[in-house]
């Protein structure tokens, strides 16, 4: 285990850090010596710090996520990241351990591919300009997000923190990559999980109801709220607290029925809610929002978890038909990135939990 970093200054004045790191393969640890420079902080959070750096041998930009390690537990994020290999998921290249300033402090450092933008910043850019994000981008970003979810769900992993800040974007190619697996977990049927996960605006209602036996469909709900945010230019359910979050959802979906509450959390006993009617979906969004977009969101943002489509099924929805056109182009004129469907379903196959999700009825 590497705990020592060696820093030195070159004649050029660059501060170079050399380290022995493990190659991020799912198998036997292979150690290599790497060095990087031009390190600067690009993100902070409760998890730790993210640095931007350049690998000395290739000048390739990388992101280094530094996380304080609890020695009592294996790091779940590292275990999961080593398993993942998908074009719409950020790639873990290397990892190493380093000592902290305090005695016995140990940090895990994940060296990840660097992707310059996020859906959050792209959406905020258009919002500040008082412009709507081009619909081709909504389709492109959502399709790739759903692809990444289809992949991780097929191997039993739930991300549990889908939000615009965790969706990285290459603005030139239009490629989206899902990042931050710090909350991710292998979900095992009938094994309890904590309900207090996922950022508030994007939390599925079963989590707000305190469910501990939830499924991968919490990620699908979160994806639906991201799509709604791209169409609206602001979060669809901007709650100030857990209870307020539920109020925001009820304002749109109406009061959940007793059966819907049971489907979200069978142990929930309080049924005292004001009776509010559902708001028509076409009145939630702008006048010229495509009917296919509204139809897809109405199927995803649904109280009953088993009624939400799987990511594979959602990818087959008519909203994404433009992406299947070989002549489709980005606003820049560039061709779309490769968008074949991955995972066990294969191209063109559909699996739904609640019947057809092909598109709005005529």
UniProtKB/Swiss-Prot annotation:
UniProt-listed GO biological process terms: cell differentiation; engulfment of apoptotic cell; establishment of mitotic spindle orientation; germ cell development; left/right axis specification; negative regulation of canonical Wnt signaling pathway; positive regulation of distal tip cell migration; positive regulation of engulfment of apoptotic cell
Binding locations of ATP: 42-50, 65
SMART domains named among the record's database cross-references: S_TKc (SM00220)
Function: Phosphorylates oma-1, a regulator of the oocyte-to-embryo transition, enabling its degradation. Phosphorylates skn-1, preventing it from accumulating in nuclei and thus inhibiting phase II gene expression in the oxidative stress defense. Involved in mesendoderm specification and mitotic spindle orientation in EMS blastomeres. Thought to be a branch point in these processes as proteins downstream are not required. Negatively regulates Wnt signaling in vulval precursor cells and acts as a Wnt-independent repressor of med-1 and med-2 in the C lineage inhibiting mesoderm development.
Catalytic residue list: 161 (proton acceptor)
Protein name per the record: Glycogen synthase kinase-3
Database matches in SUPFAM superfamilies: Protein kinase-like (PK-like)
Key word Membrane present: no
Domain Protein kinase, chain residue ranges per copy: 36-320
Gene Ontology cellular component terms for the protein in this record: cytoplasm; cytosol; nucleus
Catalysis performed (reactions): L-seryl-[tau protein] + ATP = O-phospho-L-seryl-[tau protein] + ADP + H(+); L-threonyl-[tau protein] + ATP = O-phospho-L-threonyl-[tau protein] + ADP + H(+)
Consequence of gene disruption: Worms exhibit defects in endoderm specification and mitotic spindle alignment. RNAi-mediated knockdown results in stability and delayed degradation of the maternal oocyte protein oma-1 in embryos beyond the 2-cell stage.
Keywords for the protein's UniProt record, in alphabetical order: ATP-binding, Developmental protein, Kinase, Nucleotide-binding, Serine/threonine-protein kinase, Stress response, Transferase, Wnt signaling pathway
Gene Ontology molecular functions: ATP binding; protein serine/threonine kinase activity
Entry's EC annotation: 2.7.11.26
Keyword flag Kinase: yes
Classification via PANTHER family: GLYCOGEN SYNTHASE KINASE-3 ALPHA, PROTEIN KINASE SHAGGY-RELATED
Assembly: Monomer. Interacts with axl-1.
Annotated segments matching region Disordered: 325-362
């Amino acid at each position: 285990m590497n705990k020592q970093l060696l820093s030195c200054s070159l004649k050029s004045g660059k501060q170079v850090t050399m380290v022995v790191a493990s190659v991020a393969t799912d198998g036997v640890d292979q150690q290599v010596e790497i060095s990087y420079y031009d390190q600067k902080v690009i993100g902070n959070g409760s998890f730790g710090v993210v640095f931007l750096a350049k690998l000395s041998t290739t000048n390739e930009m990388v992101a280094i996520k530094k996380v304080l390690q609890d020695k009592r537990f294996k790091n779940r994020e590292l275990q999961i990241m080593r398993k993942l290999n998908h074009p719409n998921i950020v790639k873990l290249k290397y990892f190493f351990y380093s000592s902290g300033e305090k005695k016995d402090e140990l940090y895990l450092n994940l060296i990840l591919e660097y992707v310059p933008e996020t859906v959050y910043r792209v959406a905020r850019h258009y919002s500040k300009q008082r412009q709507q994000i081009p619909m081709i981008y909504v389709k492109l970003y959502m399709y790739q997000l759903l692809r990444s979810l289809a992949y991780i769900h097929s191997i039993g992993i739930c991300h549990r923190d889908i939000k615009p800040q965790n969706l990285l974007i290459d603005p030139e190619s239009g490629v989206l990559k899902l990042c931050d697996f710090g909350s991710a977990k292998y979900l095992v049927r009938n094994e309890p999980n904590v309900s207090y996960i996922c950022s508030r605006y994007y939390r599925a209602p079963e989590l707000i109801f305190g469910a501990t036996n939830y499924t991968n469909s919490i990620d699908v709900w979160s994806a639906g709220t991201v799509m709604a945010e791209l169409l609206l230019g602001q979060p669809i359910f901007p709650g100030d607290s857990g209870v307020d979050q539920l109020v925001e959802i009820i304002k749109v979906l109406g009061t959940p029925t007793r059966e819907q509450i049971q489907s979200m959390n069978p142990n929930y006993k309080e049924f005292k809610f004001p009776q509010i009617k559902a708001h028509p979906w076409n009145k939630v969004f702008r006048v010229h929002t495509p009917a296919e977009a509204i139809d897809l969101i109405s199927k995803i943002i649904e109280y009953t978890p088993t009624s939400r489509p799987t990511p594979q099924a959602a990818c087959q929805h008519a909203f994404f038909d433009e992406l299947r056109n070989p002549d489709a182009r980005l606003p820049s004129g560039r061709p779309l990135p490769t968008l074949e469907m991955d995972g066990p379903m294969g191209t063109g196959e559909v699996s739904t939990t609640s019947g057809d999700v092909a598109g709005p009825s005529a």
